[in-house]
């Protein structure tokens, strides 16, 4: 599985 988190 793949989990990606992006914040700005």
From Swiss-Prot:
PTM comment: the record says: Glycosylated.
Q: Which domain of life is it from?
A: Eukaryota
Q: Does the keyword Heme apply?
A: no
Q: Quote the tissue specificity entry.
A: Chorionic epithelium (trophectoderm) and placental cotyledons.
UniProt keyword terms in alphabetical order: Aspartyl protease, Glycoprotein, Hydrolase, Protease, Secreted
Q: Give the top-level enzyme category.
A: hydrolase
What subcellular compartments does it reside in?
Secreted, Extracellular space
What Enzyme Commission number does this protein have? 3.4.23.-
A single cellular component GO annotation = extracellular region
Q: Which GO terms describe its molecular function?
A: aspartic-type endopeptidase activity
GO BP: any one term: proteolysis
Q: What else is known?
A: On the 2D-gel the determined pI of this protein is: 4.7, its MW is: 50 kDa.
Q: Which family does it belong to?
A: Belongs to the peptidase A1 family.
- The identity of this protein, by name, is Pregnancy-associated glycoprotein 50F
């Amino acid at each position: 599985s793949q989990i990606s988190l992006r914040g700005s």
